[in-house]
Amino acid sequence: MCGFVGFTNKINDASIVLGKMMDRIKHRGPDSDGKYVDEQIAMGFRRLSIIDLSDQGSQPIFNEDKSLVLTFNGEIYNYKDLREELVAYGHKFYTQTDSEVLIHGYEQWGEDMLDKLRGMFAFVIFNKNTNEVFGARDFFGIKPLYYAKMGETLMWGSEIKSFLDHPH
């Protein structure tokens, strides 16, 4: 079990707010944590190592040119097959994680990637070039993805209680 949180829209002390939101879900990932914060978005992750036990499996994870940022909870059962397909398209992989398959799959297929996924998952991808946020979860809802729109702010997380620390 891992967990992630995030929000759009610039706020004062975004990194501190994100840290508090992440603390609410610390039980979901005791192995490590990671953050991505810029003027547009804040994304945080709590990790429980399962597939790639190295630090290379840490999140948030980026594509090659760092234009896409991903946080992901779950397991993609067919990630090895998808990885082979993506390598054939020219994608370069730096980890053995299923999360890296998601980010390259989104680059290659966009939202159509969802039709190819087999597993239990929830994830959010931020495109820095377009300022778009794309989130999805498995079709059976095994892995949770909660979200709320509060004014101009979009919040999301693996547990709804993480929203309590956001000022909106």
Which residues does each predicted region cover?
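Cysteine-centered catalytic environments shared across enzyme families
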Residues: 1-168
